[in-house]
Amino acid sequence: MIHPVRVAHRGASGSGLAPENTLAAFERAIQLGVDAVEIDVRATRDGVVVVMHDPTIDRTTNQEGPVDERTFSQLREADAGGWFGPGFAGERIPTLQEVFDLVRHRAVAVVEIKADWLAERVLKVAHDVDVVDQIVIQSFSPETVRRINAVDPSVPTAFLLGNLPTSPARMRARRVAREVLAVGANILNVWHAALTPPFFEEMRKRGVSVWTWTVDEEAVMRDVIQMGVHGVITNHPDRLNRVLEELENEGAILVPMGRRQRLKPSRWHRRRQIRKVSRRRRPG
């Protein structure tokens, strides 16, 4: 059983930790020893790339309105932490550059792009801050993944999937593997409720690195780790650490990755081409 990559979803954003997609959440995640933080990016009206999941700031700030209809200076007036707890009042919506500055040499940034046209801007910021070898870019959009691979094929990419096709595991795996290969993704990132052992095994046979999102229940964490997934995305890295420690104490899991490997996402996925699997059962 492998030790999966630990990814803090929007930072350490679970209850009792920190408000999502803020510098406080990313700092807390790093303090908890995660391998990576997952962030969502959008652009302001004046073109600044900021970290925000929703298309509006209504849910996670004390103000309202679409991100792309406000200038960066207007967004900075919003309080992005007070809704979570008084101790976080005054947290601001961070820029992508601020997050890259925070995680540089400390953790990998898994950047989810919400619009295809942001791909080049994200890569430019990564190059400007000198973290291009410390990022993974993911998207539900095949076009975004293709675009990243075309602009900078050295950057690992992850293709996000929610529900899987309703067909037998082998057929689903064949179809999904073809799609992953077609878009050039290095990693398949699947919603945990759609991930089954037969499907995972078929993907493993085809050489596909599989991550899963967003896993917050400790029992589910244990299940997917024992299944063999290569990465786990969670709002609760504290719980994930606890589960991994339990499995390590039980002798059921390999030791964690060394620091040098943790900061090199290019080593997190299988670089060989996705394989075709014979329908005939292999002996033994």
Where are these regions (language model features)?
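Phosphate-group recognition and catalysis centered on beta-loop-alpha active-site segments
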Residues: 1-284
